Amino acid sequence: MSMALHSDAGFSKEDEIIGTLGIYTTNFNNGRLHAGTDRHASRDLSDILLTQLQRDIRSTFNVDWTRRSLWNRNYSETRLPAVPSTIVELLSHQNFADMRLGHDPNFKFTVGRALYKAILQYICSQHGRDYVVQPLPVSHFAIRFGQKKNTLELSWQGEEDPLEPTAKPREYIVYTRIGRGGFDNGVRVSSPSHTVKIEPGIVYSFKVTAVNRGGESFPSEILAAYKAKREKGQILIVNGFDRISGPAVIDTPDAAGFDLSQDPGVPYLYDISLCGAQQNFSRKEAGRRLGESSDEYEGMKIIGNTFDYPFVHGKAIQAAGNYSFVSCSDEAVEKGILSLEDYPIVDYILGLEKEDNSSNPARNTYYKTFSSPMQRILTSYCQSGGHLLVSGAYVGTDMDSSQGNKEFIQNILKYRHGNSLKTDGDKIAVRGLGHTFTLPRLPNEQSYPVTSPDCILPMSPAFPVMTYAIGNTPAAVAYQGSDYRTFVMGFPFESIREETSRNVIMASILRFLTTDYTD
């Protein structure tokens, strides 16, 4: 079979979705394919594809996605192939309502999976065979130190697919990376857990996939662990940076588009489709110049969320000396699979995490920095004497929406939101702890950009420990209480460009969190 995936032209001034069109050709070669099959097989293929796309998009995003039509037209891409052929005009690249979804990596995944499922169904139906769809990625991934010496216990959960009953995980593959090397070919396991023997002094990283007769899922986030040779403490790294997203949206009666200067979005791993910043936002120009952009990002492999940041934090912890660490997903903490109280220090990674309905218009996925369950867990951890490191670009902005959120960050984490840093240039300078370092501000090929990090203000008796060079506004706040300690950064730790700077900063933070200042 042959499928050409296109985007189409066309626009709606009322912000209605243009949606998907299918095209096939029957009037050629006496209505037959080269195998003698009726060319209406191409219509069947088109119908299955459009049906699956509309069903999955509507079910996942709760939007009334439009199935435009099935065209029997004379196009070379559907006329010339000697096999069942179709053109799928997925959406209109000229229409704002379509592209609000089209830029979202969650939407791209749903579309890709729907097309895959439809093709699988079509091929299997042609041959009279049952089909099985590959599983969804696993969740609730966590690593603990094992009961036996120098071992790690990995655990996770297989995911059911509410849209596809055949996509059940049957087995799993655990991939291992040693140090900065590449991942191995994996070990197949039958249950959602695995024990690994390790050598002290080496950072190990792991990712897990689910498998069945249909194939292998996308990989999990990457978690890391390290056993110090002369351990003086254990640290739990919690990965709370799950967000993938389209860019910030401008949607007013007069203007429409995407504001890369406010938030360029978070690609899944990377993005090669971006041309440049939008320049024309006038709704009056719809169908003409609305959406016109520059070209500064053409040919660039823009880095997004690599889901590999426990390793970055872990390498800095390793450099600090004699601290062991394990890591887990935030979902594992919220479900009680791991207890924060088992670790004297917790490093909570938030990256670019934030709840944002603007660039996630269907509101199907939420990326709250501190969910209600996590607020309760962190409150209990701090009140039991834990020491907490938090870093993320929206730790203030994302907690300004309700009085309850404000009270949590003010009373427990000891800071309040000031504002978001607005500046030009390709980098942001930060000073503190006897060091000056930079963060990338614009999309680039090395690390995700931190376009507008948070300025956070201390709640007494907390105090500022880092400042942004521009405006000298607080970038990080520390609290040294008799009950617990916190160190909160208004920017992501992993975005510090220089590894030497990350090592120095992490060592200083750990020293602050662990030193007994009463001596």
Label the model's feature ranges.
Residues Y122-T166, G215-G233:
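Pro/Thr/Ser/Gly-rich low-complexity, intrinsically disordered linker/stalk tracts
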Residues I222-P344, I349, A507-Y517:
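Aromatic-Pro/Gly-enriched surface loop or interdomain linker
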Residues R230-F241, A248-L260, G336-S402, Q480, ...:
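Short alpha-beta junction capping motif
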Residues D184-S191:
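Short beta-strand segments within Ig-like beta-sandwich modules, predominantly Fibronectin type-III
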Residues A9-S12, Y24, D64-R129, G490-F493:
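Active-site-adjacent mobile loop/cap segments within catalytic or ligand-binding domains
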Residues L352-M466, I470, I505:
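A glycine-rich, often tryptophan-bearing local segment used as a flexible ligand/cofactor-contacting loop or short
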Residues M1-T26, N30-A35, R39:
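Catalytic-core regions of hydrolytic enzymes
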Residues T195-E216:
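Beta-strand-rich modules
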